[in-house]
C-alpha cells in the first residue's frame, strides 16, 4: 500500500471539514422545520395600495425569500381540537378547509371538519381531515375566532386548544406554503376526472376540426352577483369586453387554444361571447346545485380565465398554468375593499385586466 503524502492528508482533512459542515447545516435546517415556521418576514411591497393590515408571507410563499416548502407536523405531535364553521357555497368551503388545515398545522393543533363540510367536499375530493361528531362539537368548550381574508401575524400564534374558526378566508397567504398538500387534498375522484377528460377529449376546433393544443378554462360568475356587486359593493362582474381581452391574451401566447366556458349564466355566455373563431366551446351545465362537473372541467384545463369569486379562484389554483383575472372591479370607496385585499387574493404571477367601471358611474349620476 502506498504511503499517504502530505498533500493527500491535507485534501482528506479538507474533505472531512466540508462534509461536517454540510451535515451541520442540514441538521439545523431540519430543526427549523421541526420547531415551526418563522414569520419574521413581511411580504415585500408589490407596488400596490398598501393595506391597513400587514399581510404575512409564510416561508415557501411566492414572495418569501425562503422558497422551500415546510413539512407538515406529524399527527402524533399535534394536540387540541380545531374546526371551522362551514358557510357559503362550494368555493367558500374549499377556502375554509384549506385555511383550517394550514392554520392548525402552523399552531400544532389537530384539525377536524364538521359533517356539512364533509358532505359538500368529500363527494368531489379525496380530502383527509377527520369529521367531528356532533356530540363532540356540542360538548367542546370552544373559543370562537372570525378570520379576515389574509394571513396576519396573530394567526401564527394562537394558543387556544379548542378553537372554532369562522369567516370566508380564501387567500393564498394562508396556505400557499403547503400548495402541494392542498392540491393533494383537492384531488378529484377518478370518475370525475375521467368524465371531465372525456369531455375535453371530444372537443375540436371549429374551423379546422383539429384537436386543440391548449385548453383554457373560462369561469363566468353571474347569478346573484349581478345584483350584489353593484348594489352592495359598488362593483361589477366580468363583461363581454373583458372576456374578449382575456381570450385575445391567450390567443397571442398559445398555439391553437380552445376556450372551455362554464358559468352559472350559460345563456348570457352564449349570447355575449364571440364564438365565431371556432375556438369557444360552451361546455358547462351551469347547475349550481351540482357544481363539481363544471369545476372538474376547469381543473383539467391547462390555463384559466376567471371573473370574480372563489369558485374561479380554486379552479385556477388547481389547474396551474397561466391565469387571467378581473382586476379593480370595485370603485375605490367600496366597502368591499375593507374585507378583500387584491394582493392577498390573486397570486403575484397571475395577470389582471382592469374591469370597466363605467356602468357604476352611470348608476351614481342623479
UniProtKB/Swiss-Prot annotation:
One annotated GO molecular function: galactoside 2-alpha-L-fucosyltransferase activity
Top-level taxonomic group: Eukaryota
Chief location category: Golgi
Catalytic activity, as annotated: a beta-D-galactosyl-(1->4)-N-acetyl-beta-D-glucosaminyl derivative + GDP-beta-L-fucose = an alpha-L-Fuc-(1->2)-beta-D-Gal-(1->4)-beta-D-GlcNAc derivative + GDP + H(+); a ganglioside GA1 + GDP-beta-L-fucose = a ganglioside Fuc-GA1 + GDP + H(+); a beta-D-Gal-(1->3)-beta-D-GlcNAc-(1->3)-beta-D-Gal-(1->4)-beta-D-Glc-(1<->1')-Cer(d18:1(4E)) + GDP-beta-L-fucose = alpha-L-fucosyl-(1->2)- beta-D-galactosyl-(1->3)-N-acetyl-beta-D-glucosaminyl-(1->3)-beta-D-galactosyl-(1->4)-beta-D-glucosyl-(1<->1')-N-acylsphing-4-enine + GDP + H(+); a neolactoside nLc4Cer(d18:1(4E)) + GDP-beta-L-fucose = a neolactoside IV(2)-alpha-Fuc-nLc4Cer(d18:1(4E)) + GDP + H(+)
Pathway per the UniProt entry: Protein modification; protein glycosylation
Keywords: Glycoprotein, Glycosyltransferase, Golgi apparatus, Lipid metabolism, Membrane, Signal-anchor, Transferase, Transmembrane, Transmembrane helix
Cross-referenced CDD domains: Fut1_Fut2_like
PANTHER family xref list: GALACTOSIDE 2-L-FUCOSYLTRANSFERASE, GALACTOSIDE ALPHA-(1,2)-FUCOSYLTRANSFERASE 1
Function of the protein: Catalyzes the transfer of L-fucose, from a guanosine diphosphate-beta-L-fucose, to the terminal galactose residue of glycoconjugates through an alpha(1,2) linkage leading to H antigen synthesis that is an intermediate substrate in the synthesis of ABO blood group antigens. H antigen is essential for maturation of the glomerular layer of the main olfactory bulb, in cell migration and early cell-cell contacts during tumor associated angiogenesis. Preferentially fucosylates soluble lactose and to a lesser extent fucosylates glycolipids gangliosides GA1 and GM1a.
Protein name: Galactoside alpha-(1,2)-fucosyltransferase 1
Species of provenance: Plecturocebus brunneus (Brown titi monkey)
